Amino acid sequence: MNLLNLLLILLGIILGVVVGYFVARNLLHQKQLQARQTADDIIKQGQKEADNIKKEKLLEAKEENQIIREQTESELRERRGELQRQEARLLQKEENLDRKSDLLDKKDEILEQKESKLEERQQQVDAKESSVQTLIMKHEQELERISGLTQEEAVNEQLQRVEEELSQDIAVLVKEKEKEAKEKVDKKAKELLATTVQRLAADHTTESTVSVVNLPNDEMKGRIIGREGRNIRTLETLTGIDLIIDDTPEAVILSGFDPIRREIARTALVNLVSDGRIHPGRIEEMVDKARKEVDDIIRDAGEQATFEINVHNMHPDLVKVLGRLNYRTSYGQNVLKHSIEVAHLSGMLAAELGEDVSLAKRAGLLHDVGKAIDHEVEGSHVEIGVELAKKYAENETVINAIHSHHGDVEPTSIISILVAAADALSAARPGARKETLENYIRRLERLETLSEGYDGVEKAFAIQAGREIRVIVSPDEIDDLKSYRLARDIKTQIEDELQYPGHIKVTVVRETRAVEYAK
């Protein structure tokens, strides 16, 4: 039983192995068939894709080939067109050259004909010239025989006669040309000046020698006078200006020929009236303050003038000196306004003539700068102006314009001449100046200068319209006895050197002050 089971089991195993072998072989065969089928499919698909890629590449190559062919054909067409155009131009040039060649041939023929004719004429002229020379020699011999002069003598006599006639004609012609040129120059100058003057619109007010200070009421007049007149005397002594207190309601008149001192007095008095405290100590403070205010006004006036004329890079001290001209008059004409007017005129004239407008304006503005301090420094305003310009390193053209505008020296530039012309235009304008006021001021300045020429004199003020000269002396140098002697010496010199109507009162003021401060 056991053996039979074993045999059955062994037989079953063998049968299982055989069956498994055949099953596995069948499965393997099926897989191989599937693999071959898959490989065939992949190969077919690859061939299809390769065919497609090949077709696409062929199409792209055909398209590129077509584009290249079209571009090549286009370039060939353009080159053919350019060659055709060049050929046409060459043909045109060839035709032009042929025409020019024909013209040159014709001209050569004409020239040859003309040369032939000229040779014939030259032969005829030579023959006639020979005949004329023979006749001239015969005539000269006949003339020498008749006149008794040789040919050389006759020629010299004829030349002398012709020279005399030409000299007269030349003299007449030169005179006519000079007259014509002068008329043209005069006409042009008149047109130039007329145009320049019409372009300038300047306003001027005649300066006077008085200023008026309005008061809040007439009671203020008594306070200004002060106890026993000490306030008014202090103000007059410190400023050198006359205070006229009369029946004019609510007003005090300040009289003085020096506009700067008069402005200082006016400013101080206005401040005193506004402040209400009027006594000698306060008056001194206000006068000092007024001097500083007027200095600021002077500086502002100078800066405003340079700004108006558009002049730059001027030394600040020279600008301040220029501003002092606002308080200076010449024959009643404000000198600063006159200088501005001259600057404008000089600039316009320079522009018309093509000169440096800026330099001409600068020279015109500074031409009278010496008048700002001519009553303080010896010398004419021209000399003082030249020294100021040199001191503050002004341009040589400006210095010459200042020096030559009154004819003291010869002008060295066109600008100097233009400044002198502009100065004359401004001064000669109707109503610009008044002779009487200028003479009056010069007389008062001369009176002050004469009095200040003595040792120990600190300041001198001409007041009462020149009827009194008030001399302030140093108490350390002048005692009471010398004060009387000084007054007498000044009186004698005034009588000897000045001409004046009526009498002039000489007052010598000697004041000693002792000041201490309690701490």
Swiss-Prot record:
Record family assignment: Belongs to the RNase Y family.
PANTHER family cross-referenced by the UniProt entry: RIBONUCLEASE Y (PTHR12826:SF15)
Membrane topology reported for the UniProt record: Single-pass membrane protein
Residue stretches making up the HD domain: 335-428
Family annotation (PROSITE patterns): HD (PS51831), KH_TYPE_1 (PS50084)
UniProt name for this protein: Ribonuclease Y
Organism name: Staphylococcus haemolyticus (strain JCSC1435)
Organism classification: Bacteria, Bacillati, Bacillota, Bacilli, Bacillales
Domain KH: 209-269
Gene Ontology CC, one term: plasma membrane
Transmembrane region(s): 3-23
